Amino acid sequence: MTQVLLNPSLEEAYHFLVKNMYNNLITLFGDCEIQYEGRAYSHASLASRLIIIKVDGSVIVHEHTKREPINWQPPGSVIVVRKESGVLSIESIRKRPKERLYIILRRLYYLTSAEVNSGNFDIKGTEKDIVDLVLENPNLIEEGFKPIQREYRIPYGIVDLFGYDKFGTPFVLEFKRSKATLQAVSQLHRYYMFFLESYGKARGALVSPGISEKALNLIEKLRLEYIDANRIFDSITNSSRYTINISNIQRS
């Protein structure tokens, strides 16, 4: 079921969000200011923006240009909506690492709620193919990432890709072509601990097109990282070397 409100008042929008945002995908377009506090600090002045709130706690904010959002919060974030004097606020809080996204809405042009079911996401290619893409453009992982060796053999197995981040910290990457599970996190953690004990510092990240809720919780508990491989796949959708097939999407 899909619901749409056009030019809702702040009062209407507040009650709509409280009723729907925990079970449905929310999209809204309105005039807002944004503050972010966490690993850095940023402030986005009043402008019209598209805001997406997902059932898993993800929040994404887009402006009128570029593919990447100007602000976002990952799955597992806690979202609080408040109706304050003359504004509607949406606060997204991530506990670890501690981050806070604060959106102040002054006017809404539309607000939607939709039931969206998960579909299958199949990549016609192997982990090796995805690693090849990263080696061609290391910034797909993050700015300044420097790959050193693929299939790096250690006593606990073979690391898909080993490198260093821009600060010189050893960075272990484990790639999966499908939704990551607890087993994948445990595998990464063994590799990560080896490099942590060997170098005194290390980072470990799991790269996959999806991750189970339990696996994501374990990632955060073990102070590892998750990289959504969809960012990488976006860059290859026009490439003949790979086929991305999304099927079994149910529509209401």
Swiss-Prot record:
<dbReference type="InterPro" id="IPR048302">
    <property type="entry name" value="NucS_N"/>
</dbReference>
<dbReference type="InterPro" id="IPR002793">
    <property type="entry name" value="Endonuclease_NucS"/>
</dbReference>
<keyword id="KW-0255">Endonuclease</keyword>
<keyword id="KW-0378">Hydrolase</keyword>
<dbReference type="Pfam" id="PF21003">
    <property type="entry name" value="NucS_N"/>
</dbReference>
<keyword id="KW-0238">DNA-binding</keyword>
<dbReference type="InterPro" id="IPR011856">
    <property type="entry name" value="tRNA_endonuc-like_dom_sf"/>
</dbReference>
<keyword id="KW-0963">Cytoplasm</keyword>
<dbReference type="InterPro" id="IPR049173">
    <property type="entry name" value="NucS_N_sf"/>
</dbReference>
<comment type="function">
    <text>Cleaves both 3' and 5' ssDNA extremities of branched DNA structures.</text>
</comment>
<dbReference type="GO" id="GO:0000014">
    <property type="term" value="F:single-stranded DNA endodeoxyribonuclease activity"/>
</dbReference>
<dbReference type="Pfam" id="PF01939">
    <property type="entry name" value="NucS_C"/>
</dbReference>
<dbReference type="GO" id="GO:0005737">
    <property type="term" value="C:cytoplasm"/>
</dbReference>
<keyword id="KW-0540">Nuclease</keyword>
<dbReference type="GO" id="GO:0003677">
    <property type="term" value="F:DNA binding"/>
</dbReference>
<comment type="similarity">
    <text>Belongs to the NucS endonuclease family.</text>
</comment>
<dbReference type="InterPro" id="IPR048301">
    <property type="entry name" value="NucS_C"/>
</dbReference>
<protein>
    <recommendedName>
        <fullName>Endonuclease NucS</fullName>
        <ecNumber>3.1.-.-</ecNumber>
    </recommendedName>
</protein>
